[in-house]
A protein has these predicted regions:
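Interdomain/boundary linker segments immediately adjacent to catalytic/signaling cores
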Residues: 1-2, 181
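Surface-exposed, flexible loop/turn segments at secondary-structure boundaries
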Residues: 50, 86, 106-108
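Short beta-strand-loop-alpha-helix junction that forms the active-site gateway
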Residues: 48-61
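Active-site metal-binding core of divalent-cation-utilizing nuclease and nuclease-like domains
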Residues: 2-50
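Catalytic cores of nucleic-acid endonucleases
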Residues: 59-101
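Non-catalytic C-terminal interaction segments of nucleic acid-processing enzymes
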Residues: 16, 99-181
Length: 181
């Protein structure tokens, strides 16, 4: 039975074949989000931010509902990659636009349901991927007035209130691709 660490390279291989993957695109393992309260098992940053939650045979789906809600606040696409033992419950518990992949004990992987674009992203949570200097750069680029003494959460709120999600998303993608290159 494969554990999440063994599933991750199989998943990366599948993603590289099934999705556009250019030289400048990156895979990010264990990316923290929602104020470091959550962690995505794998994120693919290409023209969008795609997150994957891995549930191995040894895991349960007991935390998936809360995890799914958090993923929806931050990522363009969300996928659940689960062991075949979890498939029925996964299909019942996943929102209709969450993609579902199944992995077996022999390193096989199959797409059960394709992910659809997520329309529930939250601008404030999206800014949580950015470091302070990246937040300041985004503010300067768009003329959003901030002060160096402002708390990071205050700057994030100002940017969320002032900018469209497309501008925030583009900056987050560029920063993450640069940071994890």
């Amino acid at each position: 039975m494969l554990n999440p660490t063994e599933i991750r390279p199989i998943l990366k291989q599948w993603v590289a074949k099934a999705m556009p993957h250019e030289e400048t695109d990156v895979f990010i393992e264990e990316l923290c989000f929602i104020d470091k309260a959550r962690r995505a098992d794998l994120v693919h940053a290409n023209g969008k931010l795609t997150a994957f939650e891995i549930k191995s045979h040894a895991d349960t789906l007991s935390r998936w509902e809360g995890q799914q809600e958090a993923y929806m606040a931050c990522f363009d696409e969300v996928w659940l990659c689960c062991h075949s033992k979890h498939l029925v419950k996964a299909l019942e518990s996943c929102l209709p636009h969450v993609g579902v992949l199944v992995v077996d004990d022999y390193s096989g992987m199959a797409m059960i349901r394709k992910a659809k674009p997520n329309k529930f992203q939250d601008k404030f949570h999206l800014t949580g991927f950015l470091w302070r200097n990246e937040l300041d750069a985004l503010a300067n680029q768009h003329g959003v007035q901030t002060k160096s003494r402002d708390l990071i959460k205050e700057v994030r709120r100002q940017l969320s209130d002032a900018l469209p999600i497309s501008e925030i998303r583009s900056h987050v993608l560029a920063c993450l691709k640069l940071r994890y290159r």
